[in-house]
Amino acid sequence: MRVIFSGGGTGGHIYPIMALIERLKEEGICQDDEILFVGTKKGLESKIVPAAGVNFKTIDIQGFDRKHLLNNVKTIQLFLKATKRAKEILADFQPDVVLGTGGYVSGAIVYEASKMKIPTMIHESNSVVGVANKFLGHYVDKICYTFDDAAKEFPEKKKLVKTGNPRSQQVLSLNAKPVDLAGDLGLNPKIPTVLVFGGSRGALAINRVMLKSLMELKKKPYQVIWATGTYYYDAIEKKLADVDYDDSIKVVPYIDNMPGLLPEMTCVVSRSGATSLAEFTALGVPVILIPSPNVTHNHQMKNAMDLEKAGAALVIAEDDLNENTFVSSIDHLLLDQSYDEKMRQASKALGVPDASDQVIKVMKEIAKKN
């Protein structure tokens, strides 16, 4: 089966595709030369995809600028060129299926594929549907989704298939080496441990509240792993030189082996991007979510609220984030074992351990109709 994948800009658009590619190869459904990822030169995908050894081509495209309307003249010009480039890629590669996960680049290639009568589908990882996926929903053959709230935004219900996020299955199948809390991090494996992190680059609001909470956290009967993010690590290290905190708080720039660490955690404090939530629910990890307000359509808050409604998370809005709400939320989770266990069960119930297989099943079905 020959497949073109497209998604751009953020990890939430890229990592589900990478999980699908891995599974397609594992099952012998696709060979390396039967898979193509179409993205942009500027997006995160331009680094991640080629580094993984996946065939990669680019389309030059940008989104509409709602503040500076004159900039949209260039946007329209780029879109017209993008559709021409998309046609060339499709004609050259001759895919059996084209799947998009979001981002303007996927809008161009998936739309053109649908016009050429090539089987098409999209996958929506968030609880709020992005602009590209909302547009493409009218043209594709199938729509895969993770959150029920997202399904409500698509008018053509016959196209909908609830599959979950492919990253869930990938995390469970990694067989990652468990992190040795004592040997690797100098922590006590016998006491509760909380991981605090804001993504690979870090989150300023989370780092600020951690700095303010250190003196209170050192008094607690649990320990903390604080992943500051690579962007903030050096500055925080300088500030910590004058702070009297003890060995129960381990400060690191980044977590290299997240699948190996998460099962060892009593709870996690995190942003609420779709990929992270797929990992948490797959493993049944209790979470305190601090959604980023700096995302389109406030989708991280909607993602987080869906988990909270299911009893799988506590949510702190960034506007409400302070030392008191932060520490008291951790206390509530770590010091009440019955609450912790209920949240683990609720989180695990939301996970989809065969999400990749479910998406691939849909891919095969629409490819047969070609």
UniProtKB/Swiss-Prot annotation:
GO terms for molecular function: undecaprenyldiphospho-muramoylpentapeptide beta-N-acetylglucosaminyltransferase activity. Its EC number is 2.4.1.227. It is an enzyme of class 2 (transferase). It is a peripheral membrane protein. Pfam families: Glyco_tran_28_C, Glyco_transf_28. GO terms for biological process: carbohydrate metabolic process; cell division; cell wall organization; lipid glycosylation; peptidoglycan biosynthetic process; regulation of cell shape. Gene3D superfamilies: Glycogen Phosphorylase B (3.40.50.2000). The keyword Transferase applies. Keywords: Cell cycle, Cell division, Cell membrane, Cell shape, Cell wall biogenesis/degradation, Glycosyltransferase, Membrane, Peptidoglycan synthesis, Transferase. It catalyses: Mur2Ac(oyl-L-Ala-gamma-D-Glu-L-Lys-D-Ala-D-Ala)-di-trans,octa-cis-undecaprenyl diphosphate + UDP-N-acetyl-alpha-D-glucosamine = beta-D-GlcNAc-(1->4)-Mur2Ac(oyl-L-Ala-gamma-D-Glu-L-Lys-D-Ala-D-Ala)-di-trans,octa-cis-undecaprenyl diphosphate + UDP + H(+). CDD domains: GT28_MurG. GO terms for cellular component: plasma membrane. UDP-N-acetyl-alpha-D-glucosamine binds at residues 10-12, 126, 200, 255, 300. InterPro entries: GlcNAc_MurG (IPR006009), Glyco_trans_28_C (IPR007235), GlycoTrans_28_N (IPR004276). It is found in: Cell membrane. Pathway: Cell wall biogenesis; peptidoglycan biosynthesis. Belongs to the glycosyltransferase 28 family. MurG subfamily. Cell wall formation. Catalyzes the transfer of a GlcNAc subunit on undecaprenyl-pyrophosphoryl-MurNAc-pentapeptide (lipid intermediate I) to form undecaprenyl-pyrophosphoryl-MurNAc-(pentapeptide)GlcNAc (lipid intermediate II). This is UDP-N-acetylglucosamine--N-acetylmuramyl-(pentapeptide) pyrophosphoryl-undecaprenol N-acetylglucosamine transferase. It comes from Lactobacillus delbrueckii subsp. bulgaricus (strain ATCC 11842 / DSM 20081 / BCRC 10696 / JCM 1002 / NBRC 13953 / NCIMB 11778 / NCTC 12712 / WDCM 00102 / Lb 14).
